[in-house]
């Protein structure tokens, strides 16, 4: 079995096992057959996201109307649920378009599969939020217009009634303070479970939401020194301590083993006192609660607050026959006004300070500026390894098992063993 086909098979299987994320596929040996010398195609997962799709189409239209455009860019949008299948099919046939979007943590997998090429942009990316720049093996393969940030939300009036202080960037809650806050809030008798951490979530939510807590305890998904083994970091003492704490939130009645389908709406309906969510919920919560809403950093569980970094990003395929034009478009799209337009349409954190300055909510002193600070201060990139889709799947299974009452050590040992076997079977995912 040749090396490229082995990589294709490994990345496609990993993708299929991780619901809700993008998987990898084969190197595109040519750009889409519909492309000509003066036209390049760009694929996006945003067919079901009209606001973001329109913002992207507006950027493309502005570029196409520019006298400096090196080619016309044609947008083709897919529903997110079918986007991965479309990419896999096109890559297998050698018909990938020139530009694709991809969920940030999966970029190394795509690069390893040899169908993304390193970016060569005229734009300086050093001022971008680090989580919006995807790298692997020392090279940059994708860049995003925005990120999102995890946080905790509560009503100031509830915290005051319970005698609990508001956590801040300067002084986040410690594990002991979090325990005390939950105990006092539960004692008010207003909620069956004062904490909602979205435990009904599936797919990428599981590693995105819960691995930062593991990291704050001192564990991790994989040893980042070479990314060759999860043994000792995913199933070591600190990781087992995290798992026991996580299940303990259920055992103590602080949170449900399986939350409702819409945790944000449940919080707004006063079914919980503290909501663990992301910046995407801020505008809706602010509109409903006004000045009673407080946004707080995640808990310092021993090694500082941690949140997951990276959202959807853009890359250029290896088979693109007009890579110069593709790179030129991406460089153009990274202008502050374009970043601001997309971030404003999606309610996300703009990738640069210059773009943030164009959005009142994210400018200095703006209501949502705190999320940008969370991202800069707390974001941890999900492991930048081609093994990530498999790692994410195995961690997700372990997290769900722990929530269901499984032995923490056993659940984490099982995940670590599977991850190590996968890495070994793929030759360490070396370039």
Task: Annotate each PLM feature.
Residues 2-107, 302, 324-325, 341, ...:
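Conserved N-terminal structural module of periplasmic/extracytoplasmic solute-binding proteins
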Residues 45, 64, 209-212, 240-322, ...:
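Extracytoplasmic/periplasmic substrate-binding proteins
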Residues 55, 156, 330-353:
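Periplasmic-binding protein-like
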Residues 62, 66-128, 135, 142, ...:
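Extracytoplasmic "Venus flytrap"/periplasmic binding protein-like
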Residues 65, 134-208, 219-258, 318, ...:
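Helix-loop-helix "hinge/cap" segment bordering the ligand-binding cleft or interdomain interface
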Residues 90, 98, 124-159, 193, ...:
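A structural signal for short loop-to-beta-strand junctions that line the ligand-binding cleft
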